[in-house]
Regions:
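Elongated scaffold/linker segments in the mid-to-C-terminal portions of large proteins
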Residues: 1-81, 160-171
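Extended, hydrophobic/aromatic-rich amphipathic alpha-helical segments that build helical scaffolds
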Residues: 9-14, 76-109, 125-135, 139
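Sequence-pattern detector for short linear motifs
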Residues: 22-25, 41, 92, 135, ...
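A generic helix-loop boundary/linker signal
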Residues: 72-73, 105, 117-119
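Long, intrinsically disordered, low-complexity segments
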Residues: 77-79, 110, 118-171
C-alpha cells in the first residue's frame, strides 16, 4: 500500500512502523544485532513482519501491566475515527461516480498524514481499500470491510503472505 509513496507519508515513517527487530537477550551473542528476515514456511520467524508502533505499548517488566509489552490490549480502544468517516464517505461518492468529492475526502485524511494528494482520476475501489489499510491499520476490522465490499477473496489471493492462504480461500 505504500508503493510510489514510500517516503511521502508519515504513517509509514520509522516512528510509526517497526520494520527492524533486534535481539534483546543481553546474554546472547546476538544481543543488539538485527534479526534477519526468514523466508521459509517452517521457520517461526516468518511471523515477524512490520507492524505499527501504536500497538507496542511500553516495553517494561512483564509483571507490571501498566508498562509491560502487551500490545496495549489493556487500554481503551478506538471504535470510530473521523478519518474512517471521511473514507466511508469517499467510498459512497465513488459508488455514485463522484470522483472529485471522493478525492476531496481522501485528501483530508492524506493531508493530515502529510501524504501527497490523490487525483480524482486515481480514485478506485482498490485505492480506497489501500488508503483504509494505511490509515486504519490495526484499528479497523479489516475482514468485515472486505466482506462488506465483496473483496475478501480477491484481496486475500492478491496480498496474503502465505501461499497456502492465497490458494485455499474459496469464493
Amino acid at each position: 500500500v505504500w508503493k510510489g509513496n514510500w517516503e511521502n507519508d508519515m504513517r509509514n515513517s520509522v516512528h510509526n512502523m517497526r520494520r527492524e527487530f533486534r535481539y534483546t537477550n543481553s546474554k546472547s551473542a546476538y544481543f543488539g544485532q538485527l534479526v534477519e528476515p526468514r523466508k521459509t514456511e517452517i521457520d517461526t520467524m516468518q511471523n515477524v513482519y512490520p507492524y505499527p508502533r501504536k500497538i507496542e505499548g511500553d516495553i517494561g517488566t512483564l509483571t507490571n501491566t501498566s508498562t509491560s509489552w502487551s500490545g496495549r490490549t489493556y487500554q481503551d480502544f478506538i471504535v470510530y475515527r473521523l478519518a474512517e468517516t471521511y473514507l466511508l464517505r469517499a467510498e459512497a461518492y465513488f459508488r455514485l461516480n463522484d470522483l472529485e468529492n471522493a478525492a476531496k475526502d481522501i485528501n483530508v485524511v492524506r493531508e493530515r498524514a502529510r501524504a501527497k494528494p490523490v487525483q480524482a482520476s486515481d480514485v478506485t475501489e482498490d485505492y480506497i481499500l489501500d488508503e483504509r489499510a494505511r490509515e486504519l491499520i490495526t484499528e479497523e476490522p479489516r475482514r468485515r470491510t472486505l466482506v462488506r465490499m465483496g473483496r475478501l477473496v480477491d484481496r486475500v489471493r492478491k496480498y496474503s503472505i502465505r501461499e497456502l492462504t492465497r490458494t485455499s480461500i474459496q469464493d
